[in-house]
Amino acid sequence: MGSSSSMWTVCVILASLASAALCANPRRPVDVQFGRNYVPTWAFDHIKYFNGGSDIQPHLDKYTGTGFQPKGSYLFGHFSMYIKMVPGDSAGTVTAFYLSSQNAEHDEIDFEFLGNRTGQPYILQTNVFTGGKGDREQRIYLWFDPTKEYHRYSILWNLYQIVFFVDEVPIRVFKNSKDLGVKFPFDQPMKIYNSLWNADDWATRGGLEKTDWSKAPFIAAYKGFHIDGCEASVNAKFCDTQGKRWWDQPEFRDLDAAQWRRLRWVRQKYTIYNYCTDTKRYPHISPPECKRDRDI
């Protein structure tokens, strides 16, 4: 009887740990071919396809970059992409993965990877626009070389928070702070945009480092193309799910303790700019949503 009881206890503990692990992170992404979810939007000839469309390589030259977007628009969900950044001298280039709506007071959720001179690290800039207002930049260095291997970059967006992930590590959280008078993206469907383009007027050292076109073409690589969201192309009200979708469940309304520790690690080790702590920009009081930032 004692042996059976002990075995039962072990099973319960293991089941609890497994359940906690599942709750801690978004559902496992389903990787599909490019054409399943996406279409090119400009400079079609600057995208090359491999492995039957499972992998693509956007190209940037002195004439143009390129981009792609999904076939539908989405309101809430989990969106991810495996990306390998432009290697070598990538100064002046920007590789972008972001969500955006389509009107003047638009919402937007940005990953922007800012290229640099050979040997210097990439900078990952994130930003959040709500009701047409942005200016919420945060910048970090990555703890790996993003040009060597594919890494997954993902966005979890629900009615409670927006979480930016690098692989399984949360690097930023933007909480719903409507009670503080801060707008939150909740009623404008967004498309997922991806692009490789020249931004040497600002991208590297504030525009001091220009794109060296003798190094062109600049080539990034994408795969994965995961979308698990509520398609709202026809009727956005359909996506007002009131807790019916997996991303609305209680375990996804805040980070768990382990995720907060990982986020704190990123903040302490790799953050190089956070608008919430920019006293030159905000000499008297930081923006109200910064009150929800546990590390400040």
Curated annotation (Swiss-Prot):
Q: Where is this site: Important for catalytic activity?
A: 110
Q: Which residues form the GH16 domain?
A: 24-222
Keywords on this record? Apoplast, Cell wall, Cell wall biogenesis/degradation, Disulfide bond, Glycoprotein, Glycosidase, Hydrolase, Secreted, Signal, Transferase
Subcellular localization is given as: Secreted, Cell wall; Secreted, Extracellular space, Apoplast
The answer, when asked if Cytoplasm is one of the entry's keywords, is no
Q: Which cysteines are joined by disulfide bonds?
A: 230-239, 276-290
EC no.? 2.4.1.207
- Cite the Gene3D superfamilies for this sequence: 2.60.120.200
PTM field: Contains at least one intrachain disulfide bond essential for its enzymatic activity. N-glycosylated; not essential for its enzymatic activity.
Entry similarity comment: Belongs to the glycosyl hydrolase 16 family. XTH group 1 subfamily.
UniProt function note: Catalyzes xyloglucan endohydrolysis (XEH) and/or endotransglycosylation (XET). Cleaves and religates xyloglucan polymers, an essential constituent of the primary cell wall, and thereby participates in cell wall construction of growing tissues.
Name of the protein? Xyloglucan endotransglucosylase/hydrolase 1
Source species, please? Glycine max (Soybean)
The encoding gene: XTH1
